[in-house]
From Swiss-Prot:
Description of how the protein assembles with itself and partners: Heterodimer. The active follitropin is a heterodimer composed of an alpha chain/CGA shared with other hormones and a unique beta chain/FSHB shown here.
Disulfide bridge positions per record: 21-69, 35-84, 38-122, 46-100, 50-102, 105-112
Mitochondrion among keywords: no
Subcellular location: Secreted
Function summary: Together with the alpha chain CGA constitutes follitropin, the follicle-stimulating hormone, and provides its biological specificity to the hormone heterodimer. Binds FSHR, a G protein-coupled receptor, on target cells to activate downstream signaling pathways. Follitropin is involved in follicle development and spermatogenesis in reproductive organs.
Membership in a protein family: Belongs to the glycoprotein hormones subunit beta family.
GO cellular component: cytoplasm; extracellular space; follicle-stimulating hormone complex
Source organism: Macaca fascicularis
Record's keyword terms, sorted: Disulfide bond, Glycoprotein, Hormone, Secreted, Signal
Residues of this chain annotated as glycosylated in UniProt: 25, 42
Signal peptide: 1-18
Protein known as: Follitropin subunit beta
PROSITE patterns: GLYCO_HORMONE_BETA_1, GLYCO_HORMONE_BETA_2
Length: 129
């Protein structure tokens, strides 16, 4: 019985005290209106949980900053989308997270809404890269 209690308390401590914000592999669909094809590429992004709390009584003198799992460092990679017309730019640049942390969401570079952009899907025929 003591082992079960210890395991329960350890799991609670782990959930409360430790953040599990880390790099994860994702697949995104890339397409351009000028091109006939859509490609799916694998990249890395940040996902997980960060310790946060929402106070019952709001103090206007003290801002309540909710922390979210977001990137600390990001690099950009470029791919060529096939099937583009000769006059069209076939290059597409996308972000790749290289380091994550729990911090304030930067709405200048990130979708900070409760419900994000939704699933990534192709409108055109898909070509695996």
């Amino acid at each position: 019985m003591k082992t079960v209690q210890f395991c329960f308390l350890f799991c609670c401590w782990k959930a409360i005290c430790c953040n599990s914000c880390e790099l994860t592999n994702i697949t995104i669909a890339i397409e351009k209106e000028e091109c006939r094809f859509c490609i799916s590429i694998n990249t890395t992004w940040c996902a997980g949980y960060c310790y946060t709390r929402d106070l019952v009584y709001k103090d206007p003198a003290r801002p309540n900053i909710q922390k979210t799992c977001t990137f600390k460092e990001v690099v950009y990679e470029t791919v060529r989308v096939p099937g583009c017309a000769h006059h069209a730019d076939s290059l597409y640049t996308y972000p790749v997270a290289t380091q994550c942390h729990c911090g304030k969401c930067d709405s200048d570079s990130t979708d900070c809404t409760v419900r994000g952009l939704g699933p990534s899907y192709c409108s055109f025929s898909e070509m695996k890269e």
